[in-house]
Amino acid sequence: MTLAKIELLKQLLRDNEAKTVLKQTTVDQYNIIRKFNTSRIERNPSLRMKWAMCSNFPLALTKGDMANRIPLEYKGIRLKTNAEDIGTKGQMCSIAAVTWWNTYGPIGDTEGFEKVYESFFLRKMRLDNATWGRITFGPVERVRKRVLLNPLTKEMPPDEASNVIMEILFPKEAGIPRESTWMHRELIKEKREKLKGTMITPIVLAYMLERELVARRRFLPVAGATSAEFIEMLHCLQGENWRQIYHPGGNKLTESRSQSMIVACRKIVRRSIVASNPLELAVEIANKTVIDTEPLKSCLAAIDGGDVACDIIRAALGLKIRQRQRFGRLELKRISGRGFKNDEEILIGNGTIQKIGIWDGEEEFHVRCGECRGILKKSKMRMEKLLINSAKKEDMKDLIILCMVFSQDTRMFQGVRGEINFLNRAGQLLSPMYQLQRYFLNRSNDLFDQWGYEEPPKASELHGINELMNASDYTLKGVVVTKNVIDDFSSTETEKVSITKNLSLIKRTGEVIMGANDVSELESQAQLMITYDTPKMWEMGTTKELVQNTYQWVLKNLVTLKAQFLLGKEDMFQWDAFEAFESIIPQKMAGQYSGFARAVLKQMRDQEVMKTDQFIKLLPFCFSPPKLRSNGEPYQFLRLMLKGGGENFIEVRKGSPLFSYNPQTEVLTICGRMMSLKGKIEDEERNRSMGNAVLAGFLVSGKYDPDLGDFKTIEELEKLKPGEKANILLYQGKPVKVVKRKRYSALSNDISQGIKRQRMTVESMGWALS
């Protein structure tokens, strides 16, 4: 096709002869005419692309040696033409040429490819190790849901990810890293090491890193599993009338951060609502909470979704939330209408009068409870219509009950037969609407009996539903089940909401969209470690979590605590951190443990035999007022028991699952987590043999003496007379000889002088508790 011919055809188009010319001209040449004669936007680009790809040679080759390697044909299949393309000046090739190139084309240097294209190779690994089941044919109910397209290494907001990528690839040009970037320093360090010396262009590296860090979510029709490992293979797993069973291989990459974030937020909300100022406490705790090594606020900003508790904490921290409304398990999104609230006194079925905020106005909502979705239409104190899809009976039942209660229908108020005085987890009385919600979820028959039944619509795609959640030829009034799919509603828009002192979220219109009472009562175990760096939160955790948090706090403030201890400040035992720890000590034993622990620590100080690991171990037990024997001496213990039984105990003289110490490596192991004491132990202590202060009233006088017989128990030691000797095991099980002191509080002059010198040194250092 020459330019002269194009000009001629242009003239022909203005003439009646154009029709004749066009009839004799091939389609691809006509396509070129249109290309040179119009600039209109293609109305159906997808169809145009499909149509173009059906031609013999739809693709253009660039000029050069690489293009010349593709043969004209392979096994009788034409791969390219000899003719020159007018647009690209190169040759045209078929789609088969792409397959030939991928199969038989040259392979360059692939060093470093697995590091760079890690996400692709992991996908291949999951595919290679996957388990494929049978294909089933038949109607597939697919629901549009917002899903993550591929698994991520670590999800973060796009702007944060771009800073992290700059820090990985161009550390010199990136400048001083922001705090939000430096939080990911472990990831940055790991990626720098991996990509070191890679000869791949930075733009490709940046693209692949973005794929690992930035979430790509789409609103896709899905049946079954929605985790990213399944969604990346969605095209192979289901269609409109077929499904393929598939289980991805390898380790699942789906993040545990999201699950741990939900657990943390639920606990923070539950702890905060019992405070005098819930909002203030929630903000304080949230700002001091870390998931793994990342602040909770960063997780909430990076990770999409979560549950009600996550949105409450987001709002408390000033972050935006997705547009939705909650009423317990019921999730709502307004379709149309507006309501106005007025307080009214309502006579309910049990004869009591309740003051309730009644919503006036016609409103329509998209509703969801678990996997059951529907459309609710309501007016003042009346549920007009509820259209739902088929799902699990439990979800259908809960959705219907919650919509009936949410609509504030008069029949619902009349259905109350018993008392409504439910409490939340904090022991507080719930508001009337939440009382009614709890009541009817427990006693659904009271509601359904009062509600009444009617004939279902005659339409073939609709059917009725009875009180047992079965399809029926009669239906609960206003409730209809559709055989068609109701798509999941997408909450893509975010909005800034205000939050009240009592953790209720309010839109600009004044509408309350969710509150602390909507937070799930479910208790879950976090998949990642959650650290609440505030004692106000620790008592909400398990015994092990409280032990871990308390000892972490002691380690963090060790220098200060040691200084206070050596200065003889007795009020040092009264920290909030130890008050929380007291809640896991059996009440009857708290005073005895305190007297024992204080006596041992005092003896260490008096004799200048500080053992840092023993100091850390016993310090939290000193909070309670000490309880001594009638003779003024402390009780003696080998094991300090904590609440919960099992492994919940601390061994005084050796290691235990909760607390153990390795003096060779100077590493403490708290609940399985290792913490180093390097740099926190003075040389004098490190070089000294085991200290004397193990048991109050006893001194270590030498090594194990076989002439003294077997190791004595605590009970046997107590029977010794002053000056008598015995063998015992101390610390991590070291055998030594001890002697019972003649005077419990005796101090020699040189020890007194030593303590004075030590105190002067500490005072000159100065200290402050972090």
Curated annotation (Swiss-Prot):
Descriptive protein name: Polymerase basic protein 2
Species annotation: Influenza B virus (strain B/Ann Arbor/1/1966 [wild-type])
GO BP term, pick one: symbiont-mediated suppression of host mRNA transcription via inhibition of RNA polymerase II activity
Job of this protein: Plays an essential role in transcription initiation and cap-stealing mechanism, in which cellular capped pre-mRNAs are used to generate primers for viral transcription. Recognizes and binds a wide range of cap structures of target pre-RNAs which are subsequently cleaved after 10-13 nucleotides by the viral protein PA. Plays a role in the initiation of the viral genome replication and modulates the activity of the ribonucleoprotein (RNP) complex.
Keywords assigned by UniProt, alphabetized: Cap snatching, Eukaryotic host gene expression shutoff by virus, Eukaryotic host transcription shutoff by virus, Host gene expression shutoff by virus, Host nucleus, Host-virus interaction, Inhibition of host RNA polymerase II by virus, mRNA capping, mRNA processing, Viral transcription, Virion
Stored Gene3D superfamilies: Polymerase Basic Protein 2, C-terminal domain
Matching InterPro entries: Flu_PB2_2nd, Flu_PB2_6th, Flu_PB2_C, Flu_PB2_CAP-bd, Flu_PB2_middle, Flu_PB2_N, INV_PB2, PB2_helical
Positions occupied by motif Nuclear localization signal: 740-743
Coiled coil (residue ranges): none
Assembly information from the UniProt record: Influenza RNA polymerase is composed of three subunits: PB1, PB2 and PA. Interacts (via N-terminus) with PB1 (via C-terminus). Interacts with nucleoprotein NP (via N-terminus).
Family under the similarity heading: Belongs to the influenza viruses PB2 family.
SUPFAM superfamilies assigned: PB2 C-terminal domain-like (SSF160453)
GO function terms (MF aspect): RNA binding; RNA-directed RNA polymerase activity
A single Gene Ontology CC term: host cell nucleus
Subcellular location: Virion; Host nucleus
Matches recorded under Pfam families: Flu_PB2_1st, Flu_PB2_2nd, Flu_PB2_3rd, Flu_PB2_4th, Flu_PB2_5th, Flu_PB2_6th, Flu_PB2_7th
